[in-house]
Each structure stands twice: as structure tokens, then as C-alpha cells.
């Protein structure tokens, strides 16, 4: 009886399909000193083939726009995006979606208090391909000087 139960458990383990965790975006972080207490924080998204990530300026009513919140210091000006921006009208949402494929570099000026040696924050983003969209995801980051 024990052998039968053991065999059933092992069989179920190998037969039950394992859920595949999709993670089509990886982030790299860097910082460039621009002044005594002024830094340029770079959050670079590397996007897998056939996937795209939405712009920080993606319109309301569409997919989740990328948001980057900085916990340390004070942001100076608006976040900039460096990459090949694409715009497509999505009839499901009724808006022009703005997104990037392959890669995008989000750049934000941050003024830090004297002695602060790190920039931390959270990225909220959503990715889609031609068949599916993944739910919005939060990623915490820490950039050391």
C-alpha cells in the first residue's frame, strides 16, 4: 500500500504541469553625478523579444503607464525616456498606446541630501505581447553611489 501511494505521488509530481513564471523585463541601474548634490538616476529596462513596456506618459484609459517613484532626495523635473517610442491605436482601450520594445532608459534628476550614498525607489510597470498582458508589477530598487 505504501508503495502504491508513493508511486501515485511521484507520478502526480511529474504529470502535473509546472506553472511557467514569465518575467520578460530586467532592469539595470546606474547613476551619474551632475553636481555637488545632484545626480542623474538611470533605470534601464531590457525587454524580451516580442514584448513591450508602456511609457511613463501612456494615456489614462489604456494599459498601466510605467511609474518610477524615488524614495531618497527630491526629483528635479520630469522623468525622461531614451529609446524608440512607438504609438499604436488600440480599439479595445480607445486610446493611442505609447510603448517601447527591446529597451528603454528612464532618466531622472535627483537632488540628494549631503551624505546620502544611495537612491531607492519602486518601479511599477506592465508588459504585453501580441497575445497577452501581464498584470502590473512592482520592483524595488537601490542604486549605490
Regions found by a protein language model. Name each.
Residues 4-16:
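Sec-dependent N-terminal signal peptides
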Residues 20-145:
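Extracellular/lumen-exposed scaffold segments
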Amino acid at each position: 500500500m505504501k508503495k502504491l501511494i508513493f508511486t501515485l505521488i511521484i507520478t502526480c509530481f511529474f504529470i502535473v504541469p509546472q506553472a511557467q513564471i514569465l518575467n520578460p523585463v530586467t532592469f539595470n541601474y546606474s547613476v551619474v553625478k551632475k553636481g555637488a548634490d545632484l545626480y542623474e538616476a538611470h533605470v534601464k529596462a531590457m525587454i524580451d523579444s516580442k514584448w513591450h513596456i508602456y511609457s511613463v506618459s501612456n494615456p489614462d484609459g489604456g494599459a498601466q503607464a510605467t511609474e518610477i517613484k524615488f524614495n531618497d532626495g527630491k526629483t528635479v523635473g520630469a522623468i525622461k525616456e531614451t529609446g524608440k517610442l512607438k504609438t499604436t491605436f488600440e480599439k479595445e482601450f480607445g486610446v493611442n498606446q505609447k510603448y517601447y520594445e527591446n529597451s528603454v532608459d528612464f532618466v531622472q534628476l535627483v537632488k540628494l541630501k549631503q551624505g546620502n550614498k544611495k537612491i531607492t525607489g519602486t518601479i511599477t510597470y506592465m508588459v504585453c505581447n501580441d497575445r497577452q498582458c501581464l498584470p502590473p508589477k512592482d520592483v524595488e530598487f537601490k542604486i549605490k553611489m
